[in-house]
Amino acid sequence: MKKNMKRMMGWIFTAVLICCIGFTIKGVTADAAIVSGGKKNYSYSELQKDLKQLKKKYKNRCQVNVIGKSEDKRNLYEVVIGNPDAKKHLLVMGNLHAREHMTVQLCMKQIEYYLSNYNKKISGKKVSNTLDKVAIHYVPSCNPDGTAISQRGFNAIRNKKLRSALRKMGGSSSRWKANARGVDLNRNWNVAFKTSGRKGSSGYCGPKAESESETRALVKWSNRIQKQGKIVGIVSYHSTGSIIYGKSTSRAPKAVRNATTRMYQTAKSLTGYQLVQHESYALPHGYSRTYYLYKKKIPFITVEVGRGAAPLGGGEFGSIWAKNKNVVIREAQLFQ
């Protein structure tokens, strides 16, 4: 009888334990991550869905704004985390080059990670304290049309005229770097500009500086923020080679050069990515980094993630995430 009673009590205890574990699992599932990790093709529709959920979940910690439209009329989204009225602002741009679309997913994972750890410490500093002093402004996807081409081909472009013109250009759709008009958005900026190349997957600067709606929207975006306060630095994410462009020449003021060096050293300490040593004194034509570093006098680093050629396979995301998850918040900590 006693043995049966003990056996019964053991069953009851096991059943209660299973129920408790079930509730715990339910709790974890309810608080599961919004932004996926490790997918090869993080799409524009996923970006929109995730932004909507992040805004709903963290409505007091972030803002989602539309700063303009692409040539094929997709929204260019800005995500502001922290105090929008802060005196200092850090800008982050992803996906200027279409096939480097894993940077969209990386930016979105960073946004969620910082928001979910808002009241915790990263590298010994409370995230909320940093973001109260330095607001971070992300544009996760600067080139949504080009990304759609890289992921789904020319048929992803909705405008018939644009789609027809694209088919006449050279270049593989999956390896596409440019926007929907065949213009490289990283070479379309109003600094030492001169037209070179031809419309296609890569290398074409455009008929004139800021000819593309995406470039104009980004310039307007940074100008607006500069009127609100000081832009302390810019991080631009690309995805080729696990390197960092972090050098600058005497064309930039000493304070800007020093801040850029500190930004590079911070990123290198976390990622292990090496510095690109060559930095020509002659201004590269129409580059975004050239524009901000030398014309706008803003510290700027370009972080190239990934080992292989873009578009990167989903299997690379885990390593990229481990190295880069703290990069942007640590850059903000430099200036708080």
Language-model segments: residues:
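Short beta-strand-to-loop junctions in surface cap/lid or active-site-entrance loops
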Residues: 78-86, 95
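Bacterial N-terminal signal peptides
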Residues: 11-24
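Extracytoplasmic/secreted proteins, especially bacterial periplasmic and envelope-associated proteins
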Residues: 42, 46-53, 102-113, 137, ...
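Active-site/substrate-binding loop(s) of hydrolase catalytic cores
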Residues: 102, 109-247, 302-304
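Loop/turn elements at helix/coil->beta-strand transitions in domains of secreted/extracellular proteins
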Residues: 59-63, 72-76, 86-89, 132-137, ...
